[in-house]
């Protein structure tokens, strides 16, 4: 439909699954872009995602955990920022109101995206994950994926990597509601 519209980026929680797109929040009133993070089509049969989750993408959050540049989340964060670029390139986008939302892993990606891109004007982060991983050392609960509970005490490279992608470090950079 002709006109200029606000936009909404939806980033996913953890897992490997299909996405149908958000056609229900504000149909005809907002541009919505819902993205996956794994670089695979989001419209395949559930059995394909189940096989990937149990195989090639099993524990994807640990991939490259010895280097912030090789970390799985490096590509994921860049992808979220590129999604903002794409929205901003649309002639239908009003150039004023751009939100990002997600829960758990998506909540973390919402915070990170809003902290890194000033074009994001609002966010809705629902129980963001990837937070305060070092709470493990203080015998406190930490955020998903609980790296050190399941994988043991980290070496210095792993610790540096999880610190780099810790949502708490991005939250302090937020300038949007």
Describe the predicted segments one by one.
Residues 3-14:
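Short beta-strand element of the alpha/beta-hydrolase
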Residues 82-141:
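Primarily recognizes the serine-hydrolase "nucleophile elbow" in alpha/beta-hydrolase
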Residues 23-24, 29-78, 135-142:
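Cap/lid segment of the alpha/beta-hydrolase catalytic domain
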Residues 138-177:
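The feature captures the conserved acid-bearing segment of alpha/beta-hydrolase catalytic domains
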């Amino acid at each position: 439909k002709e006109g200029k519209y606000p936009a909404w980026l939806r980033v996913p929680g953890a897992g490997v699954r299909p996405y149908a797109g958000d056609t229900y929040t504000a149909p005809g009133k907002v541009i919505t872009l819902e993205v996956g993070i794994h670089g695979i089509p989001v419209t395949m049969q559930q059995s394909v995602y189940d096989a990937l989750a149990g195989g090639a993408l099993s524990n994807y959050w640990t991939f490259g955990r010895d280097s912030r540049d090789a970390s799985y989340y490096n590509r994921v964060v860049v992808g979220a920022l590129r999604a903002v670029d794409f929205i901003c390139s649309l002639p239908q986008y009003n150039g004023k109101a751009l939100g990002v939302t997600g829960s758990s892993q998506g909540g973390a990606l919402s915070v990170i995206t809003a902290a890194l891109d000033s074009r994001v004007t609002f966010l809705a982060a629902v129980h963001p994950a990837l937070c305060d991983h070092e709470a493990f050392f203080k015998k406190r609960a930490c955020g998903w994926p609980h790296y050190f509970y399941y994988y043991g005490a980290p070496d210095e490279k792993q610790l540096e990597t999880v610190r780099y992608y810790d949502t708490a470090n991005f939250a302090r950079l937020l300038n949007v509601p």
